[in-house]
A protein has these predicted regions:
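Nucleotide-activated donor-binding/catalytic signature segment of Leloir-type glycosyltransferases, i.e.
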Residues: 278-301, 309
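Short alpha-helical segment that forms part of, or immediately flanks, the ligand-binding pocket
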Residues: 301, 323-328, 339-343
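Aromatic "clamp/platform" in nucleotide-sugar-dependent glycosyltransferases that forms part
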Residues: 315
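Membrane-proximal helix-turn-helix segments that form the acceptor-binding/catalytic region
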Residues: 152-194
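Conserved catalytic-core segment of nucleotide-activated headgroup transferases in glycan assembly
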Residues: 237-279
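Carbohydrate-associated surface elements
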Residues: 200, 220
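A charged, aromatic-enriched C-terminal amphipathic alpha-helix characteristic of glycosyltransferases
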Residues: 232, 359-367, 373-404
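Short hydrophobic beta-strand element within catalytic cores of glycosyltransferases
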Residues: 312, 332-335, 342
Length: 405
């Protein structure tokens, strides 16, 4: 079996983490696998490019720069195609699986992608298409993260905010939504199978494109994290005041980090110690430790291991890997209500909370937080979580899925 994983970025973001992990696990299993990505920072080759085998940067820098510049006006990526891979795919001996992940974010023109798939299928009928939906982009006119907006159910009549990612200056979502959805119907006609790690994304997709069109395979922790877990000694009792972690790529973004909730935790003063991990922290105080954005996962996991809990308040994530990772190392997660957090936590017997319930919880010991969130002791919660978010299980589900296509 020959598998090509496609994602806009190689090693940045949750979708990249899933795609890259599937790629690495497939290679370990002796399968033929390649990872095709759009671009790295600034449109250049990813800084992680040389760290992984069988990876290919696919898009010229000028294409991504042009898409970034024009997207704000046109609400779609005007340029970018996969035509330079046509011969590679069609000349491959044996069945080929093209597994798409995130294709938006200034990488590819969707119409060009569908046309490419049609040509490949006509030339090489044993090609199969799989598309993992990591966000809501397949149902909206423009954005990937709806942040609570349900305008897509009414064909994106008027965007309530132009700032939902990817942001724009002019709202053209209503003009684009039907044409975009037709392209997804065209992919279904080509036999593309859609998967999502999260039930609520699958439900949204199925409500538009037909019952059962999108199936569920939950995300799992990656190979690197599993290696780190094997070496980490779980910290059951932390010394001093409760240590609470907040993790986000950009800590300023309220959609990912509820700014008021963090400030309310800061107002607890010396009752807690707040640790942030991410860029551009706007939080400064006597009880705040800003670690910055930690690119070394080993260091991040080691730091989280010493925390009483991770507080998660994102409204825009769909099946956040950081939750799977924290839970797998035995760090309780105190999450505010959202479909994503509820879905992840329920898998290990946990629950979510309202904002006003968070403040009393963060003042508890690690064991008491585990009891409050998961209804069990710390060790039982840790063992349950380790099994629930297994990356090996994710691979086995996908490989079984590929083989049954």
């Amino acid at each position: 079996m020959n598998i090509l994983q496609f994602n806009v970025r190689l090693a940045e973001g949750g979708a990249a983490g899933v795609a890259l992990d599937l790629h690495q696990r497939a290679l370990q299993k002796g399968l033929q696998s390649r990872f095709v990505y759009g671009y790295g920072k600034g449109g250049k080759k990813s800084v992680s490019h040389d760290n992984y085998p069988q990876v290919l940067k696919q898009t010229p820098r000028l294409t991504s720069i042009a898409n970034i510049a024009l997207f704000r006006l046109f609400n779609r990526d005007l340029f970018g195609n996969l035509n330079n891979l046509y011969r590679t795919v069609t000349h491959t001996r044996g069945p080929v699986v093209l597994h798409f992940h995130v294709l938006h974010s200034y990488w590819l023109n969707l119409e060009e992608v569908v046309a490419f798939c049609g040509k490949v299928k006509a030339h090489k009928p044993d090609t199969r298409f799989v598309w993992t939906l990591h966000d809501h982009w397949s149902v909206t006119g423009r954005c990937a993260f709806t942040d609570g907006c349900e305008g897509w159910k009414d064909n994106c009549q008027k965007c309530p905010t132009l700032s939902n990612y990817p942001p724009v200056k002019v709202d053209r979502a209503h003009q684009l939504v039907e044409g975009k959805r037709q392209l997804f119907r065209d992919m279904l006609s080509l036999g593309c199978t859609f998967i999502s790690p999260s039930q609520h994304v699958a439900d949204a997709f199925n409500s538009l494109y037909g019952a059962g069109r999108c199936q569920i395979i939950n995300n799992g922790i990656d190979v690197a994290t599993e290696e780190i877990l094997a070496e980490l000694t779980p910290v059951a009792i932390t010394t001093g005041k409760p240590k609470i972690a907040v993790v986000a790529h950009d800590l300023r973004y309220d959609g990912k980090t509820n700014q008021q909730l963090v400030r309310d935790m800061m107002a607890l003063g010396d009752k807690i110690e707040l640790h942030t991990f991410g860029k551009f922290s706007p939080f400064e105080g006597a009880n705040v430790v800003n670690h910055g954005f930690e690119t070394d996962k080993r260091k991040l996991m080691s730091a989280l291991n010493g925390m009483n809990a991770l507080v998660f308040s994102s409204r825009v994530d769909n099946y956040p890997l950081i939750l799977c990772e924290a839970l797998s190392i035995g760090v309780p997660v105190i999450a505010t209500h959202s479909d994503a957090a509820r879905e992840v936590l329920e898998k290990s017997g946990g629950k979510t909370f309202s904002e006003n319930e968070v403040l009393p919880l963060v003042q508890l010991s690690k064991a008491d937080i585990a009891q409050a969130v998961f209804g069990t002791d710390l060790e039982s919660f840790r063992n349950r979580s380790r099994k629930a978010y297994s990356g090996q299980q994710m691979l086995e589900e996908y490989v079984s899925f590929y083989q049954n296509l």
